[in-house]
Amino acid sequence: MIFSGKFTSHLLNYGFKPNNLRLLSTSTHPTIYFTGIQPTGIPHLGNFFGSIEPWTELQNSVDKNILMMLSVVDQHAISLGPLPANELRQNTHQMTASLIACGVDPNRTLLFRQSDVPQIAQISWILGSLQTTSKLARLPQYKEKKERFKKGDIPVGLLTYPLLQAADVLTFKATTVPVGEDQSQHLNLLGGLAYAFNKTYETEIFPIPKQLTRESHARIRSLREPEKKMSKSSGGPRSRIEITDSRSTIIEKCQKAQSDNAGKVTYDKENRLAVSNLLDLYSAVTKTQTSEIDFSNWTTLDLKMNLAEAVDKRLAPIRQKFEELQNTGEVDKVLTENGEKAREIAEKNLEEIRRTIGFL
């Protein structure tokens, strides 16, 4: 395992000694992959290419004896405040169905709902005793999101979000966490907490998880505002393509996507960002590099229609599988059975932790 300079620097805050680096890189813990995804309902293409597809590719390529865990993190979904119960329930069901439709295999990936494993919250509380509010308040994501609360009435869940995130991983002693670069600081904090716990209690209970970031296509951006990433939080429905969108909806959204009137299509992010954004999306959907696409004779209308055709072709089987799942009890069955399996692992690890710190 190779640690970045930032990561090693972060561990220094917990009393880490540089000559102990080898101890961290020779963990005897079995390899366990873990990641989480918030239940925001139906995923869009940004979610698909950014996290779901990389996970399914990993799932289908690693040794079958390696445990892979994917959590639908419904407790994180209320970190900014409560949601209507029916909305959260529906979003969780839709996200789970979407993951299965996109290729997440519940027989290969332990796909479960976070709130079905109460041990995670208990371990989050324990980790909180090793962290300070000042360090949590300095994290960039906290600084950014707290600005939404102009009156200063910031939910506690926003501040402690990284502790729960760390508990998600450490509860299962995960060794590898596939996440984007935007989560690097939270993962650094996670590693620091694992090290601090081990050092405080003179144990090796927790592995120091490593971040797995794959090289991928350019970040999927909004169809209406190409300077921003594709998101449900801004831009409106026409700014994104969801994985269950109908063919007609996909065509309409592509036709109305921002472009320009500069004639033939060229790839120029500096001067033609909107057109380049559509080419990046076409590249991701067709699994080709932008340099391999012959768009020399395309107009912007050609680009939009070709993009719509490619997106519909890619999403058609996913859309069909999602619809099939709506008429069965498979989603609930997966959440129930895998929730039991996840709790069994978590309870065993929690008992070890409780004995270590003196609760037992």
Swiss-Prot record:
UniProt keyword list: Aminoacyl-tRNA synthetase, ATP-binding, Ligase, Mitochondrion, Nucleotide-binding, Protein biosynthesis, Transit peptide
Disulfide bond annotation, renumbered to this chain: none
Binding site for L-tryptophan: 168
Top EC class for this record: ligase
Enzyme Commission designation: 6.1.1.2
GO biological process, one term: mitochondrial tryptophanyl-tRNA aminoacylation
InterPro entries linked to this entry: aa-tRNA-synth_I_CS (IPR001412), aa-tRNA-synth_Ic (IPR002305), Rossmann-like_a/b/a_fold (IPR014729), Trp-tRNA-ligase (IPR002306), Trp-tRNA_synthetase (IPR050203)
A Pfam family annotated for this UniProt entry: tRNA-synt_1b
Superkingdom of this protein's organism: Eukaryota
GO terms for MF: ATP binding; tryptophan-tRNA ligase activity
Chain segments carrying region Disordered: 220-241
A GO term from the CC aspect: mitochondrion
Major localization class: mitochondrion
Motif ('KMSKS' region): 229-233
Subcellular location: Mitochondrion matrix
UniProt keyword annotation of Lipid biosynthesis present: no
Motif mapping: 'HIGH' region: 39-47
Biased composition (Basic and acidic residues): 220-230
Catalytic activity from the UniProt record: tRNA(Trp) + L-tryptophan + ATP = L-tryptophyl-tRNA(Trp) + AMP + diphosphate + H(+)
Anything else known: Complex locus in which transcription results in the production of one large primary transcript that gives rise to two functionally distinct proteins, wars-2 and prx-10.
Primary role: Catalyzes the attachment of tryptophan to tRNA(Trp).
Entry similarity comment: Belongs to the class-I aminoacyl-tRNA synthetase family.
UniProt cross-references to NCBIfam families, sorted A to Z: trpS
Name assigned to this protein: Tryptophan--tRNA ligase, mitochondrial
Originating organism: Caenorhabditis elegans
